[in-house]
Structure formats: C-alpha cells, structure tokens
C-alpha cells in the first residue's frame, strides 16, 4: 500500500515537472529562486507588475533597466529589469529578527527574457530567505510576503 502510494505520488510529481515548462505555474528551485512564465511582453509585464504593486499600496522603490545599464557599459544582454518594492511595516520585521536579512529586503523581482524570447519573472523564495538567515519566529510574516508576491506575479500569468 505504501509503495503504491509512493509510486502514485512520484508519477504525479513527474507529471507536474514535465508540464511545468509550458505552464505559468511558479517553479521553485533549490537555490531559492522562484520563476514564473509571463503571458505578456517584457514592457507589458513590467507595467502590469508595477501597477499591481502600487494598487496594493506597496512602496515601489525603483525599476532598474539592467539591459540599458549593460548597453551603456558596452555589453549586450537580453532584456532584464529589476523591480524593487516592499512594505516597510512588514519587511522591517525580518530585519528586526536578523539584521543581515537586509540583504534580501526590500523585495527584488526580476523580469527577464530568455533565449527563446519568453518573458519570465524571478524572485527569491521567502521560505528560502527565512532558512538562509535562520529566522524561525516570523512564520506569519513570511506567509504574508509569499501570498503577496504570488498575487503580484499572478497578474502576468494569464491573458
């Protein structure tokens, strides 16, 4: 019975993994990076995300066009833009637990184009951030941050 359940679970996992490249579902990797495929162009993805951040009352700190920075430095890269935002009353709770967690706050969401022209979003998983910094007493806050980033990235997942 246990073996059958294990095989069933593994088959389900394999199906999810195989379907993932064509799905807008967020993909978390062991390095803590969560990637989500966007259904929109680069510019529209950035526009939708920044508007959603502001509509949620979250502070938009900066939008950094990394491809422009690279071009200005004489380097050619695919489109890549870093969006920096956060909610200081929430984010500073992580810093109060571990000051070095400031390396991961405010939130940074990368919008980039891959070699096939597909637009993606990427951010650091909040559970991974908690583990990285050894923060064990901010579970509800990490849960809230995870819910917010999932909501923001969902704004670019469907047409």
Predicted regions and their residues:
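N-terminal export leaders
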Residues: 3-10
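C-terminal segment of classical bacterial N-terminal signal peptides
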Residues: 16-25
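Terminal, regulation- and interaction-focused segments at domain boundaries
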Residues: 25-57
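Mature soluble domains of exported/periplasmic/lumenal proteins and thiol-rich metal-chelating peptides
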Residues: 31-37, 76, 99, 116
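Extracytoplasmic/secreted envelope proteins and their assembly/folding machinery
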Residues: 43-46, 50, 67, 146-150
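Compact, glycine-rich, soluble single-domain proteins
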Residues: 50, 54-58, 62-107, 111
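Beta-strand/loop substructures that line and gate deep hydrophobic ligand-binding cavities in soluble
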Residues: 108-134
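C-terminal partner/receptor-binding element of secreted or periplasmic proteins
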Residues: 126-159
